Amino acid sequence: MDTTNSSRWSELPIDILRSLLEQKGGCAIYNPDEAKDYKTKRDSSGIRFLANSVNWFLVLDSRSNLYIIDVFSEKKIDLPPLESIKNGLYSLEQVGDEKKKEYIVVWFFDKGTEYIAFCKNGEDHYRDIPIRKNVCKELQDLYDMLLHGGNNLYISKTRQSIRKLRFFEEEGFIDVDNSEILPFRKISFYIDGARFSNNIAVTTSREVLLVQNFFYETTRYRSFRLYKKDPNPDLNATINNPYPMVELCSLGDVSASGFGDRKRSCLDMCMFNLVTKKLKRFPDLSNLKLTDARCTTTSSGNNWKFSIIVSEVIDSKFLELRFADLDSESQQQTKLKFSMLKSEFVDMNKEDSQIEINEKETKINQEHDQSDETQAKRRRSLTSSVWQDLVSVGGEANVKEIDRSMETPNSSPPWSELPGDILRSVFERLSFVDFQRAKQTCPIKRSKSNCLRLWLITFGGLERLPHLSSVCFISWT
């Protein structure tokens, strides 16, 4: 991968960047127990929500700073800068105080990286987990990663195995015994035009599963299989296969009768129940022009709630978000309508909301119908301070039919000391609103390379907070 000049924002013209990234941010919290949504008082413009654990959110701002915020208060926890990675293992101060909020952040830049970085509360730098050097051949490389339970990290390897790490307060981390390694299930057949991937899943009882996905290019057909470690393996069979696996279920071949006869191409939103082995479809969500969707699982004691948040572009001005409770038989949806030009939203469930919607649509239409000359002048008014709030589109974007008359001179100062390829990996992934607006502005091809992946698990101090276990979130930028 070529390294770009870190002092430059992007090869895209200024007006395209402005169109993509001028949208102010916001965050709405939806509580399914109360069937109400709340808008936080915190200003969330210029930041991206990456992950969350109940009310604590991991965010990234335009200067590539990472920190954790409490969306219900002004509490903020600063994380070390991305360039603060230090080699080697270090001791950790005891952090078992119940009054402290304990967290761990784990990330990597690209699947070809040589390390995974992690940080716990109380540390001022990231420590690295080597995945190439000083690691046995069977545990090298990285394919997928899952942080579960606050102290267990599962890493799927390209050599058909899963590496499990356990975090400790003083030792940092250790590799678990090889007996807990879950090998990939080798593909016994291959069909032309088919692609497959192996991913990790962990159940609520902490049982590790292997999810094998198949996608057929010619028919656009998908199927998957679930495997787990064989609890009662045949001793004779373990001679050639020391880690035998058993198939839990499959979907897309024999078990998919009634789902594979669809003649029209549309998106399916489904939930598969491991206990009943049944697939539950949500037809109301299948015909949406989705730009993004996020599934969440929340718990309250032994009760688990599965929910989904989807987004649909209504037109060039509005985006509609729908929240659906997957456990509810009625599949009742809560709708929120967001302005893509203003940081405003309307509760679609209110009886008197239609009047408010019409008023907002009229107002935004008037602003949207400004002349091209006025729009060009507004774009030319960008200053260095505005540049500081923008995020690089990055990636290998292909832009056509660009209006050069709207370009603005590059007034941005060097915005980071990180190498260009790392910056591109961090910021190449656009939020769903921005990417939809990009497609309306000009044809853009998204890069296939990997972006920054982060996980946040809070494993102490939050279980005593009432009425927060079922809170889901909606975010947009």
Swiss-Prot record:
Protein name, entry field? Probable F-box protein At5g25300
Establish whether keyword Coiled coil is in the entry. Answer: yes
Q: Matching InterPro entries, A to Z?
A: F-box-like_dom_sf (IPR036047), F-box_BR-signaling (IPR050942), KIB1-4_b-propeller (IPR005174)
Keyword terms of this UniProt record: Coiled coil
Short name of one Pfam family: Beta-prop_KIB1-4
Which parts form a coiled-coil structure per UniProt? 346-377
Q: Which residues form the F-box domain?
A: 412-458
